[in-house]
Regions:
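Active-site neighborhoods and metal-handling regions in enzymes and metal-associated proteins
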Residues: 1-160
Length: 160
């Protein structure tokens, strides 16, 4: 069971947000990157996880894929240490992306999870949350754009 459809983004489609349609003609290449976003339901409680992967041996793709995960870990560390708001989390994420020559796409802006459906509990985004997000309830989403390669990378997980 899942609360949202599984999303697969390949190559140029890695720049697209969750709501944008994938290009059905894009195929995984020998050297490529892609991300998968899954939204399972476990015992009526929602989960959400997304990560970028690479195939082949392109070090630029590997660095881009790692950047989304690394920025997530960095931002989550600030949240754990200082108990900062969702607004501040995304300011830090944008700063960390810029330090790497990347851009943060804030249309993938984090959200609350809960008992299915989570929309009954909160309809806003993490990026607009002025309070400190509660662990195991909020999802931090990092969608990056590499303007040089015109590709993206994505990482999301529950703040724990």
């Amino acid at each position: 069971e899942r609360w949202h459809p599984t999303k697969l983004r390949i190559g140029p489609d890695t720049l697209k947000t969750f709501s944008q349609k994938a290009d059905q003609l894009i195929r995984l290449q020998e050297n490529d990157l892609f991300f998968i976003d899954v939204g399972p339901i476990f015992e009526q409680h929602e989960g959400d996880y997304g990560q970028t992967y690479t195939v082949g041996s392109n070090s630029q793709f590997e660095e881009l894929a790692a950047a989304a995960r690394d920025i997530f870990i960095e931002v989550q560390g600030h949240w754990r240490a200082a108990g900062i708001s969702g607004i501040e989390l995304y300011k830090i994420a944008a700063h960390e992306a810029a330090k790497r020559g990347l851009e943060l796409n804030t249309k993938m802006d984090g959200h609350r999870l809960g008992d299915f459906p989570h929309g009954l509990f909160h309809k806003g985004s993490l990026i607009d949350c002025s309070e400190t997000p509660i662990q195991n309830v909020w999802v931090l989403e990092i969608l990056l754009k590499d303007p040089k390669q015109n590709l993206g990378s994505f990482f999301e997980d529950i703040l724990i």
